[in-house]
Amino acid sequence: MKQRVLVASNRGPVSYQFDADGSLAGQRGGGGMIAGVTEGLVALGPEADVTWICAALSDADRVAAALQLAAARAGVREEGGIRVRMLDIPPDIFDRAYNNVANSALWFVHHLLFDTPTQPQFGHEFQRDWESYLTYNETFADALAQRAREALSGEVGQGRPPSGGPRILIQDYHLCLVPRMLRERLGGAARDVGIGHFSHTPWAPPDYYRMLPEQVGRALLDGILGADHAGFHAERWATAFVQCCAAILGAEVAPAGATWRVTYRGHVTEVAVHPLGVDAPALRERARAGDVQAHVSMLRAAAADRKLIVRVDRTELSKNIVRGLVAYRELLATRPQWRGRVVHLAFAYPSRSALAEYRAYTDRVRRLAREITEEFGTPDWDPLILEVKDDYPRSLAACAVADVLLVNPVRDGMNLVAQEGPVLSERGCALVLSREAGAAATLAADALLVNPYDITETAEALHQALAMPDAERQRRSAALAAVAAADPPARWLGGQLAALRS
């Protein structure tokens, strides 16, 4: 039977920009979630009927969305075998929903980022922002309901049974309310579709989650419990979610083998863990391309046979770049034997520059990098190379040449870099990994786990990684790569679809 899949996410698989002549140019959307979902959908094969609904994020996206409305299939455009529908949400609504609620409140709660003596402060302005978040989610629910009804009516017209109805995959904290809204819009037809929600972030424990206003916290949980299946990257995040459901909503929670069954408002939601790894063959093939190999040559020349500590992150508060740099400074201060023998490549992608906290954080990263270079650098040795720009080939090259990979988030839903590094490593890399990354659940056996807040422990782990015998480093790296390749995007997404079919 032909698979019908609807995907909904804030960011889509394609984004647009204006060329010099004013024409639209499309490019693949960025981010680990986009890559994972896209690769999983491609693995379904050409017979799958896939529509991806996303928000128009830029002026160019909004023009593209308007042009799509004139297409034969209103609002739908083909992109690499996936039909994409961009929703033109009013900019003020989008800004308040995305920046003020999703990124400034929900992201901070789930990553435990608030400076609690002064933050958060939920007042009348936040209530206005919350109304925008409601509107934003309603827009997605309306679009999904329309597409689901079209799919169901097509099946009835062609004599197909309703069990072949669409499976709907709703992504992340931007769209927590959509599952319940969609179920209410579909009414009785909801039994003929499968509604799934996946959280790519951690989930806050109940005591911290209660920081949100009561009606907001309850609405988010109730929204996700409108789904038939709710997925998380790691067991600890799924456990925190069901604990919140029990403590805050009074929902009935029961373990069911490797999953949980949460009963609320007469509906049962299955909560399960789906770790996301990497497509190792595709990743290695991409790394063999000329643009990546050119960066490999440049990085090796810059290192001049010195050992390389590599990090690849967004300039995101939770990625903990500042403490990572401080740990590197402590390594050089307390282990002088590494001076002149190691280079730290810190490659970062600009992130959320619309938020003042992120601009200040990026400035602090740049300032700290300068201080380390001024303190330890010599005429023939730059201890640190920091680049803050979007350069995917450079990032792949850095992973390929790394002797040590530093991944030290204060909290992370999964973290793909920790898995991509060992897969791409040419000589074997030692992984220094935060115990607070979701990936630690699968990679702990062969990584050097650290408390991301402990600078001294991180510096010592960097020393151990640098001093690790080649044979041990290569053995660990191979084991890490095997684990990372065991849960490729096709398996990750296929597991969710299978759960919805059951």
Q: Which role fits each region the language model picked out?
A:
Residues M1-S502:
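Catalytic cores of carbohydrate-active enzymes across secretory and cytosolic contexts
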